[in-house]
């Protein structure tokens, strides 16, 4: 063996020893597989199944694609109260048109949604908190039967969450969900108000402009989003009352079912608010109900552009057994967008078979018929103002 090879050996040996030692001293867990999926087949009284604005009137019988999220995570280190976990997720979507659908076209896509490390117990001043970095679904708030994420600042980022702070827990994060828009997210949660729990949050978003963008006069005004959510346990379920107020790039999402992401279509002179009341309750042994009501207002003084909307929807379920139920989903939406009216309503009936009696039990297979009507326009195939859809869909999460 030459001296050169000896030097290589001595350089590699300590690394190999360290890796081997770590394998024997770290208690790593098994890989966890989590995910979400929906898929099916449908048609309408005028060709293919036609779907529109499910965030306004409901998603049951109003989803025309195959969509899935596949998540892998593993705790790689667990010692002395300190843990490190890595998580990665891919999502994919296809048009549900046929057998072979390559995920490389404009309509069929695959995306990296999560890739992060979460470390707990490593902060001396807050051992209960989690330190994290990477792409992450971050503390998302959603209404399931609408597929509406009304508070969501997910994306690449870093932060600390779950710091014990008086009556609640404090979290802070830096994320980016849109281009060069940096978001600072601050939340204080778990504040007890009688039997209810209050969470408040403030999001600050500001573009990070290049010199060329500055020279071109691009706007970089600070946008703010304030959110308050009061959660109350009722009727073997819960009710949530949400208030949101946004300015600048956070104003426009208040009128179009946006979440916590900055909207570049409006970057100065705007303000808006949104009220949401939603929940899932169990009024009797065989009946469960998911419901939502929303009202939003948007104003743009610079552009003299004002709009408002309201939406109401409900999905009651009657359980015939622990594994079979009947759904009725109804939804109504109306808006006035700077003098232009829009209106949409939907009614869906479905027979479903689920893996258990709970409203949240999945997997589930459902057969549905859905009628959607546009009261002001003709958005459907052939210039029609309404459509009747039929189909079968599965939904699962694990």
Curated annotation (Swiss-Prot):
Keywords associated with the record:
Cell outer membrane, Ion transport, Membrane, Porin, Signal, Sugar transport, Transmembrane, Transmembrane beta strand, Transport
**Which SUPFAM superfamilies does the entry link to?**
Porins
- What job does the chain carry out? Involved in the transport of maltose and maltodextrins.
Q: Where is the signal peptide?
A: 1-30
Q: Which GO terms describe its biological process?
A: monoatomic ion transport
Q: How does it assemble?
A: Homotrimer formed of three 18-stranded antiparallel beta-barrels, containing three independent channels.
| Induction cue | By maltose.
Q: Which reaction does it catalyse?
A: beta-maltose(in) = beta-maltose(out)
Tell me if Transmembrane is a UniProt keyword of this record: yes
**Top-level division of the source organism's lineage:** Bacteria
Q: What is its main location?
A: membrane
Record family assignment: Belongs to the porin LamB (TC 1.B.3) family.
Cellular localisation: Cell outer membrane
Provide an example Pfam family for this protein.
LamB
Q: Cite the InterPro entries for this sequence.
A: G_neg_Bact_CarbUptk_Porin, Maltoporin, Porin_LamB, Porin_LamB_sf
This protein is called Maltoporin
GO cellular component terms, A-Z: cell outer membrane; pore complex
How is this protein situated with respect to the membrane? Multi-pass membrane protein
């Amino acid at each position: 063996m030459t001296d050169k090879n000896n030097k290589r050996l001595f350089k590699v040996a300590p690394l190999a020893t360290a890796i081997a030692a770590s394998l024997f001293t770290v208690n790593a867990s098994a890989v966890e597989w989590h995910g979400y999926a929906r898929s099916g087949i449908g048609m309408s009284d005028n060709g293919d199944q036609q779907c529109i604005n499910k965030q306004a009137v409901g998603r049951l019988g109003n989803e025309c694609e195959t969509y899935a999220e596949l998540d892998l995570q593993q705790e790689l280190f667990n010692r002395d109260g300190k843990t490190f976990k890595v998580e990665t997720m891919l999502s994919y979507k296809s048009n549900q048109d046929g057998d072979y659908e390559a995920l490389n076209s404009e309509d069929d896509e695959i995306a990296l949604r999560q890739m992060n490390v979460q470390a707990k117990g490593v902060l001396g001043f807050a051992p209960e908190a989690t330190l994290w970095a990477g792409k992450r679904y971050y503390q998302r708030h959603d209404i399931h039967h609408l597929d509406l994420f009304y508070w969501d600042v997910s994306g690449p980022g870093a932060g600390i969450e779950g710091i014990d702070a008086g009556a609640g827990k404090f979290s802070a994060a830096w994320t980016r969900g849109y281009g060069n828009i940096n978001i600072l997210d601050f939340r204080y949660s778990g504040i007890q108000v009688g039997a209810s729990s209050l969470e408040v949050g403030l999001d600050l978003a500001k573009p990070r402009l290049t010199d060329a963008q500055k020279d071109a006069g691009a706007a970089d005004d600070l946008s703010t989003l304030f959110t308050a959510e009061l959660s109350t346990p009722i009727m073997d379920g819960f009710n949530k009352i949400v208030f949101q107020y946004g300015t600048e790039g956070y104003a426009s999402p208040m009128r179009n079912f946006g979440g916590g992401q900055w909207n570049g279509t409006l970057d100065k002179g705007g303000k808006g608010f949104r009220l949401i009341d939603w929940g899932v309750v169990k009024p009797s042994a065989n009946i469960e109900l998911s419901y939502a009501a929303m009202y939003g207002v948007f104003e743009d003084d610079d552009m003299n552009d004002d709009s408002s909307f309201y939406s109401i929807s409900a999905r009651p379920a009657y359980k015939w057994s622990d594994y079979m139920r009947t759904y009725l989903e109804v939804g109504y939406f109306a808006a006035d967008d700077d003098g232009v009216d829009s209106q949409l309503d939907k009614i869906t009936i479905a027979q479903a078979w689920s893996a258990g009696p709970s409203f949240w039990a999945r997997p589930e297979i459902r057969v549905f018929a859905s009628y959607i009507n546009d009261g002001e326009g003709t958005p459907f195939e052939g210039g029609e103002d309404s459509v009747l859809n039929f189909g079968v869909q599965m939904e699962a999460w694990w």
